[in-house]
Curated annotation (Swiss-Prot):
Annotated transmembrane regions: none
Main location: endoplasmic reticulum
Organism, scientific name: Pleuronectes platessa
UniProt entry tagged with the keyword Heme: yes
Induction text: By 3-methylcholanthrene (3MC) and isosafrole (ISF).
Protein name: Cytochrome P450 1A1
């Protein structure tokens, strides 16, 4: 996080810097003087002693999820650090997190009013907005309903399908052809480069009813912007934690604004096109579904929450922006793990061959018959923990947790990485072992163990796209494992070191893939 301070150096005069530092020192001393009183019967939060102005930033390092996990061993599952001038409560341990986000869900359902969050989707993002009142709930419910209507099977047998499945099957088939072509031409491929475009095409199909060529510059540009967005948000903006910096010029913040404006312009253009071709009797995609709902609400005089055209753009922007980063990261990591563990890759292929066969594509309805694949995905989410934290929460009122007093409007970090690597919860947590989720005979996934994995948050702010994301990861993997055998490049070491961000990516690399013998054309 200290690295994020660097863009300010050199862009501000010495006199401006001195004024800013003096102001921050005065504010810090005033805040220390008026320190919150602790109600009788409760304790003050433990935690490391902060430095003036910068707080505990130096102690977080480049991998804050590891640093905060180490701190939890010393201070417990509820402790406080200070980032810049903002107090932050860090929660770990599955029992503590469930208590906060489920049993005391209303008290921890807020989002902190971070400066950078105000510019995400014009401050009206479902995921980042501080709002949690009626309008926010109505928009969240509407977005969830629209997602479900295009991604839910009406039955559990192969003859049933849904829009999500159709798009994944189409893109999965194209991805296999694309990788085969690249392998013949270049001898290797960048897994992230091709997977992310395929996944982006699925959400484009769901939201906009269109797909793009893998080399389409507009789509490639948006994918790149999404990657930048995750990096900036994950690193933390200094102005979020030292308010005076909001008024100083920042190249990084200027770039962040550009990213968000580009996303909004892209979605606005497509939503406008949908309005001109909208037909109530032919709902083509999620955007049409939202427009239809909006028109119905405008005609309904008794409706408590009117949905403006601007809010439709906001919802679609949210769904599109979040619709491919998590899934593409999960799939890219999955391919890396397949290469790192060839014996597991072979078991997965054998399961698909035995339960699905090789004469047709796997489908969503096959999922219950592929328990080892489901266990593999759970172990990917747990072991990689590429979503190390949830988006920060915030307390909505003065509250307490585990006997500690937490004031209203306190920023709260949920350390998902710690939960997924807690030795009290997992046997040998550092080892990659999908079998940990299977029943003794390997015939089914232990649901209780699966629910221990934390990747999509919990409670009122839980990711609305979780079910879709899990289904998408499952079906893409089943399709490519059935057709392709992934291999490392001879002589090159596979680097599984994560790079920190909102979603942690592996380092870009190249791999090899061959068509399975019975799938050769």
């Amino acid at each position: 996080m200290m690295l994020m301070m660097l863009p300010f150096i050199g862009s501000v005069s010495v006199s401006e810097s001195l004024v800013a530092m003096t102001t921050m020192c005065l504010v810090y001393l005033i805040l220390k003087f008026f320190q919150t009183e602790i109600p009788e019967g409760l304790r003050r939060l433990p935690g490391p002693k902060p430095l003036p102005i910068i707080g505990n930033v130096l102690g977080l390092g480049s991998k804050p999820y590891l640093s905060l996990t180490a701190m939890s061993k010393r201070y417990g599952h509820v402790f406080q650090i200070q980032i810049g001038m903002r107090p932050v409560v860090v929660l770990s341990g599955t029992g503590t997190v469930r208590q906060a986000l489920i049993k005391q869900g209303d008290e921890f359902a807020g989002r902190p009013d971070l400066y950078s969050f105000r510019f995400i989707n014009a401050g009206k993002s479902l995921a980042f907005s501080t709002d949690q009142a009626g309008v926010w709930r109505a928009r969240r419910k509407l977005a969830y309903s629209a997602l479900r209507s295009f991604s839910t099977l009406e039955g559990t047998t192969p003859e049933y399908s849904c829009v999500l499945e159709e798009h994944i099957c189409k893109e999965g088939e194209y991805l296999i052809k694309q990788l085969n072509t690249v392998m013949k031409a270049d001898g290797s491929f960048d897994p992230f480069r091709h997977i992310v475009v395929s996944v982006a095409n699925v959400i484009c199909g769901m939201c906009f009813g269109r797909r793009y060529d893998h080399d389409d510059q507009e789509l490639v540009s948006l994918v790149t912007l999404s990657d930048e967005f995750g990096r900036v948000v994950g690193s933390g903006n200094p102005a979020d934690f030292i308010p005076i910096l909001q008024y100083l010029p920042s190249a990084e913040m200027k770039n962040f604004l550009r990213i968000n404006e580009h996303f909004t312009e892209f979605v606005q253009k497509i939503v406008t096109e949908h309005y001109t071709t909208f037909n109530k009797d032919n709902i083509r995609d999620i955007t049409d579904s939202l427009i239809d709902h909006c028109e119905d609400r405008k005609l309904d005089e008794n409706s408590n929450v009117q949905m403006s055209d601007e809010k439709i753009v906001g919802i679609v922007n949210d769904l599109f922006g979040a619709g491919f980063d998590t899934v593409s990261t999960a799939l890219s990591w999955s391919v890396m793990y397949l290469v790192a563990h060839p014996e597991i890759q072979e078991r997965l292929y054998q399961e698909i061959e035995d339960k699905v066969g090789l004469d047709r594509m796997p489908l969503l309805s096959d999922k219950p018959n592929l328990p080892f694949l489901e266990a593999f995905i759970l172990e990917i989410l747990r072991h990689s923990s590429f979503l190390p934290f949830t988006i920060p929460h915030c307390t909505t009122k003065d509250t307490s947790l585990n006997g500690y007093f937490i004031p209203k409007d306190t920023c709260v970090f949920i350390n998902q990485w710690q939960i997924n690597h807690d030795p009290e919860l997992w046997k040998d947590p550092s080892s990659f072992n999908p079998d940990r989720f299977l029943s003794a005979d390997g015939s089914e996934v232990n649901k209780l163990d699966g629910e221990k994995v934390m990747a999509f948050g919990m409670g009122k702010r839980r990711c609305i796209g979780e079910v879709i994301a899990r289904n998408e990861v499952y079906l893409f993997l089943a399709i490519i494992i059935q057709k392709l055998h992934f291999l490392p490049i001879p002589g090159e070491k596979l680097d599984m070191t994560p790079e920190y961000g909102l979603t942690m990516k592996h380092k870009r690399c190249h791999l090899k893939a061959t068509m399975r013998a019975r799938n050769e054309h």
